[in-house]
Amino acid sequence: MTPLLFPLLLASLLPSSSCNKANKHKPWIEAEYQGIVMENDNTVLLNPPLFALDKDAPLRYAGEICGFRLHGSGVPFEAVILDKATGEGLIRAKEPVDCEAQKEHTFTIQAYDCGEGPDGANTKKSHKATVHVRVNDVNEFAPVFVERLYRAAVTEGKLYDRILRVEAIDGDCSPQYSQICYYEILTPNTPFLIDNDGNIENTEKLQYSGEKLYKFTVTAYDCGKKRAADDAEVEIQVKPTCKPSWQGWNKRIEYAPGAGSLALFPGIRLETCDEPLWNIQATIELQTSHVAKGCDRDNYSERALRKLCGAAPGEVDLLPMPGPNANWTAGLSVHYSQDSSLIYWFNGTQAVQVPLGGAAGLGSGPPDSLSDHFTLSFWMKHGVTPNKGKKEEETIVCNTVQNEDGFSHYSLTVHGCRIAFLYWPLLESARPVKFLWKLEQVCDDEWHHYALNLEFPTVTLYADGISFDPALIHDNGLIHPPRREPALMIGACWAEEKNKEKEKGGDNSTDATAGDPLPIHHYFHGYLAGFSVRSGRLESREVIECLYACREGLDYRDFESLGKGMKVHVNPSQSLLTLEGDDVETFNHALQHVAYMNTLRFATPGVRPLRLTTAVKCFSEESCVSIPEVEGYVVVLQPDAPQILLSGTAHFARPAVDFEGPEGVPLFPDLQITCSISHQVEAKKDESWQGTVTDTRMSDEIVHNLDGCEISLVGDDLDPERESLLLDMASLQQRGLELTNTSAYLTIAGVESITVYEEILRQARYRLRHGAALYARKFRLSCSEMNGRYSSNEFIVEVSVLHSVNRVAHPSHMLSSQQFLHRGHQPPPEMAGHSLASSHRNSMVPSAATLIIVVCVGFLVLMVVLGLVRIHSLHRRVSGASGPPGASSDPKDPDLFWDDSALTIIVNPMESYQSRQVCVAGAAGGQQDDEDSSDSEAADSPSSDERRIIETPPHRY
C-alpha cells in the first residue's frame, strides 16, 4: 500500500511547484485615496479611482485581482471588485451615512490577486493604502433659536449699540449649512435693527411716556437660505431714567403667627445704574416700640409669667398700686400700658421714699437681707433730656441697709447712655465700687426691662433678657459716705453729709422733706414700672431671659452662604440689623435672607414699621450715587384664636339633705375643658366630584394653660346666712392659685394647666344651711387664658333643691299626697323665681294612673270653680245696690253661699314661676268672661308633657 501512495503524492506536488513559479508578483495600488460620499447616500467617489495592478498579467489567476479588504474598527464601508482583469474596484457605504454623526472616516485598503488557480492558492496581497472619506452635508436641518422668548430692558432717551443678542443654531454638519448667515425682524414698523450676528439695537430714542413694552418677531436663515422653522419673540421694556434704588421689594409684608422665620426682601436687588461701588452698608430697622413694652412678649400677666418661667417667689414690689397699705406712690403720675400694667411717670422733680417694715415688705430682716445677694428688676423708658447736660446724673434707686456689721449702701443711676451701679459693702471700713455699662437702650426713649444681679463682687446687668458685663469698674474711694440710717428712695437720692451745702444750689436738687434734714438730688426723669427687689437667691439667666426677652425681631441665619467680605451685625434687642459688603450681587443675596421672626404662638397682631437705610462708597466720589430710603411694614395677622370649651351636666337636682351636708354638692362633677384652634384648610379636590370645591376649617386640640376661672350667680347674689360656695383652699395654695370668694362670684386666678383647673373646679361645691327654703339656683362658669385675652364659653348649670312636704288631710278627700302642697300651706316667697330640675322628678311625680286621675279631677274642680265664680259674680251684680260688693242678700241661701272649704288648691313645686303666672292669667280671664273659658283651659294647662297640675291664684286662710 505504501509504494502506491508515494507516487500519487509526488504527482500532486509537481503542478503546485509550477504554479508558484507563475504568481511571482503581488498586486499594486495607490498609497492614499481621497473619497467623498454624499449624506444619505452610499457611493464613494475616490480620487484617484480605485484600480489594482499586477505584473503577472495577463496570466490567468496570477494576473487577476480577486478583491479588496478594508481594515479598521467599525468601518461603515465595503470594497467590491468591478473587473478582475483591470483591477477596477469600488468603495461604497454599507448603509447611508450621516454627516451629523461623523463627518470624516479613515481606514486602510488592501488588494489581493486570485492566486495560482481557481482555488485561490498562493494568493498575494498588495500593500495597505490609506483611504480618507469625507461625508458631504445636505441642508436637511432648519435653524433653531436657543430661546423662544427674549427679554430686555432699556432706559429711555438712550441709543444702544446692542440691547440684546438673539441666537439660532443649525443642526447640519457643514459650515455652509450649519452657519446662520443672517437674521431678520418680521414685525414691521419697529424702531429696532438686527445684524447678521443677531444683535438688536434701537434706531431711535425710546420714551417711557410712549410705548413701555415693544414686542416683535425675528427669524434666522442659514447659509443654504433655509429659514428657521419656529420664529423667536422679543420683548423690550422701556424704563424711565435710571435712578439708583432698591428694586423688587414689597411695602406690605404679611406674617402669619406660627410661620417661623419669614424673609422680608426675598426678591430685592440694588440698582446702581452701572456706577461701580466698593462699599455698601445697609441698616434694617424694625420698630416695635408701640407693641406693649417695646416688643412682643408673652401675653401672660407678670405673676403668671414668673410661675411659667420657674422664677423663685419672694420678690417685693417697691412701686405698687396706690392704696391704704401703699400710700408712698400716691403722689406719682400713674399710666397704664397696653397690657394693663401700671406705669409711673417721674418728671425730674419728684421721688418716693419707700417705708421700711411691713408696709413694703422690707425692713432690717436678716443680716444679709439686702447686703450682697439680691436682684433688682424693673422696666424703664428713658431718654436724654434736652435741657439737661449729658453728665447730669439721675438716680433710679438709692438704698442704705443696716446689717450686723454696720451699714451698706447701693445706688443705681443713669447719665446719658450710661447706667452705673454704686455699691458700698460697708460704710465704716470698705471702699465703694462703681460698675459702669454703656448701652443704647438706656437713652433710646423706648421700653426695656433691666435686671441687676448682685453677688458681690460679681455684678451682672440684664437688658431685655440679655446679659451685659460691666464695661468699666471704678474704685471710688474718695466718695463721702452717705448717712448711716436705713432708707430706700426711688427716683432720687439724698446728699451725703459733707456735700450738703454744695448740693443745695444744684439744678437737680431740692430741700429735704419734713423729717429729713438732708437735701434730695439727682432726680430721675422717665418712666418706671414693675420695680421689685428680691434678696437671697438670685434669678438665673434662663429665668430672666424667659421672663423679659423679646419674642419678635430681625433674624439672619444664612451664614453658610454668606459671601466673602460680608459682615452682619444684629443689636441685642434684634430690632436693628446691619449688613456691610463690597460686591453688589453678594450684598443682594445677603439682604434677601434677612427675616422677621416671632416665636409666640399667639403673637400680638398689628403693624411693625420697617425701614431700610443704605450708604454706599464709590470709586469716583464726584459721581457717587445716593440710595433712597426704603420704608415698609410687617403686618402680623390675627392669630387663630384658641377655643376654650366648657362642657358637662347643665341641669341636675338633689335632695335638700345633700346640699345641707358639711361638704355640700359638687357643681361641676363631670366638667370637661378642651382647648382647640380652628384653622383654614383647603379641601382636596376629588376628580369624581362635579360640584364646587371650597375651603373648610379644621380644629386641632392643643395643650394650653388657663390663667383664671370665675363662678358667678345668674340672678340674685348668694345669701351668706343661708348658702355658700366651697372650694379646697389647701389645694389652691399648693398650686399657687389665688381665690376670691364673694356673694356675687368666686374667682380662681393663676396660670395652670387645663387638667389642674378641671380637677379644682370639679371640687367646687354648693352648700345650704339646714332649713333654708331655696329651690333652685343657676351658676355661670367661664375661664380665660393669656391675661384674659381669650375667654371660654359661658357654661350655665341649673341646680334644683328637692324638698319633702308632710301629708296634709284634705277636706274633700279628692287628693292627698306628700308630693303636693295644700293651699293652706302656701310656699314661702323665696320659692318665687326658682324652678326644680326635671332630670330627677321621679321622686316627686306620682304614677301614671295617679297623674291621669289628678288631671281629670282637677279639670272637674276647675269647672265647678268657674261655675261658682260665675254665679257669685251675677249675684254681686244683682245685690250691688243693697249691700257691699261680694255680700249675699240672704246668707242662708245655699245657692248663693260661697264655700271656700270645698275648694282645694294644688301647687306644683316643679313648675317655674313663669308658668304659674300664665296659669293665673288664664284663670283670671275665665272669671271675667265665660266665653273665654276655652282660652282659660289652655292657659291653665302647663306645657310640661310629664304632668299637668291645675293651679289657682293663692289665697290666705
Curated annotation (Swiss-Prot):
Extracellular compartment spans: 20-848
Membrane-related topology note: Single-pass type I membrane protein
SMART domains per the UniProt record, alphabetical: CA (SM00112)
Question: Which subcellular locations apply to this protein?
Answer: Postsynaptic cell membrane; Endoplasmic reticulum membrane; Golgi apparatus membrane; Cell projection, Dendrite
Biased-composition ranges, Acidic residues, are 928-938
The text the record gives for the protein's domains is: The cytoplasmic domain binds synaptic Ca(2+).
Name the record gives this protein: Calsyntenin-3
